[in-house]
A protein has these predicted regions:
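Nucleotide and nucleotide-moiety/phosphate-recognizing core
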Residues: 2-160, 165-182, 189-194, 200
Length: 202
């Protein structure tokens, strides 16, 4: 792989899990093992290195054998704070982010995002599902150049927290994925039960 195409994968597990009763979503069992481990297993073949962003239970996550970093910005500042942390600790030119509650994520996620990023010479590539009225950006499934770190730092320092507001200031390549189910987030305990016997796409 060319050096300028090397990718680090970041699993975002730094949220409060409020819709799941304020539990750590990445550690909730799904088909016999923590959701975060399912995510790591599907992301690992697609990247050179792996990182986890978490703000609680750091020792538990570290036991999985992957480097774990809490937000550099205090106060559970959202997914941009996780991206910021990942960029700070990324040793490759590119960083891909995925949430810890997405055990069905596509096995071609990085390849498709990479192709669009390179073709459009974009700052970021973001997954999109659906068409027309059902079109839905998936902003936490993103591939970013590490060069955007100073820009993101300035945005966060100015109080910015909304992902779409920051993306609007950058050149973003949107990449359509046909399999909407692959981007399913498990946000509640009911969904955890409902989808616990669903097999991910190969």
């Amino acid at each position: 792989m060319r050096k300028d195409m090397e990718v680090t994968g970041l699993v975002l597990a730094g949220g409060r899990g409020t819709r799941m009763g304020s539990v750590d979503k990445g550690l909730q069992l799904f088909n016999g093992k923590p959701m975060g481990q399912h995510v790591l297993e599907r992301l690992r073949p697609q990247v050179l290195h792996l990182l986890i962003n978490a703000n609680q239970n750091l020792e538990t996550y570290s036991a999985w054998g992957t480097a774990v970093w809490p937000d550099a910005i205090a106060g559970f500042a959202g997914p941009l704070a996780g991206l910021h942390t990942g960029l700070l600790h990324c040793n490759t030119p590119l960083l891909v982010t995925v949430p810890c509650d997405s055990p069905f994520l596509p096995l071609d996620l990085v390849a498709k995002l990479m192709a669009a990023l390179q073709a459009q010479d974009a700052d970021l590539a973001v997954a999109v599902t659906g068409q027309g009225s059902t079109r839905q950006p998936q902003p936490v499934f993103t591939l970013a150049r590490v060069d955007v770190l100073p820009h993101l730092t300035a945005f966060l320092s100015g109080g910015g927290r909304k992902v779409d507001a920051w993306y609007a200031t950058l050149k973003v390549a949107e990449v359509n994925f046909e399999d909407e189910a692959a981007f399913r987030n498990i946000n509640t305990l009911a969904e955890l039960q409902e989808f616990s016997h669903t097999a991910p796409a190969p």
